[in-house]
Regions:
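Short, solvent-exposed turn/loop segments enriched in Gly/Ser/Thr/Pro and often Arg
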Residues: 3, 58, 78-82, 161-169
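Active-site rim elements
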Residues: 5, 26-35, 48-53, 133-142
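Long, internal low-complexity/basic segments
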Residues: 15, 136-169
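A structural signal for well-ordered alpha-helical segments within the folded catalytic domains
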Residues: 13-14, 36-43, 57-60, 118-121, ...
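Histidine-centered active-site microenvironments of extracellular/periplasmic hydrolases
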Residues: 1-37
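Conserved beta-strand positions that form and line the central face of beta-propeller blades
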Residues: 8-9, 18, 31, 61-64, ...
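C-terminal cap/loop subdomain of S1 sulfatases and analogous C-terminal strand-loop tails that border
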Residues: 39-42, 47-122
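A short aromatic-rich beta-strand->coil structural motif
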Residues: 18-19, 45, 107-140, 149
């Protein structure tokens, strides 16, 4: 996909299995499907350990999912890349990509929208295209989906005080 290291939102780098062992809450092993954002990890662990979650901490506890009292249905994950121009990654093209700001969402129905004001935007159906090889962004059938997903990213930006420029979609 033209980016190196773990500086990318593509599933090969961003979709990481999460293993939590919490025998005090659940004795049996189980696989939990759904989207889980890294930002929710610390609040979840603190909650599982019975600790207070500091108000300044971003994210939401998903401990009820671990305890079997809830699921991740409807959970959407937002991601941001603010450009890291810290070293030469090999070619001018890769260095340029590494310096761009990206905002992304993965919806609960496994669609991913990557927005960048200075590069081509991307839309992937992760159910049918888990390796993100078929960019559906310019497919007219997806206009409404893109608008809805972009609006969710903008709402997330508003809620978090993020001011990265986004393309008009």
């Amino acid at each position: 996909h033209g980016m190196m290291e773990m500086r990318t939102f593509y599933e090969e780098a961003a979709k990481v299995p999460l293993i939590i062992r919490a025998p005090m809450h659940n004795k049996e092993s189980k696989l939990i499907d759904g989207n889980f954002g890294q930002i929710d990890l610390v609040p979840t662990l603190l909650d599982l350990l019975g600790q207070d979650i500091p108000e300044h901490l971003q994210g939401t506890s998903k401990s009820d999912v671990i305890k079997g009292k809830a699921d991740l249905e409807g959970n959407e994950v937002f991601m941001e890349h603010n450009g890291i121009g810290d070293r030469n990654l090999g070619t001018p093209a890769i260095n340029m990509l590494n310096n761009m700001q990206w905002r992304s969402i993965v919806t609960s129905d496994r669609w991913k929208l990557n927005l960048c004001a200075t590069d081509q935007c991307e839309l992937f159906n992760l159910n049918d295209d888990p390796f993100e090889e078929n960019n559906l962004f310019n497919d007219p059938e997806n206009k409404d989906k893109i608008r809805i997903m972009a609006a969710k990213i903008r709402m997330w930006q508003h809620e978090t005080g993020d001011n990265a420029a986004l393309p008009g979609v």
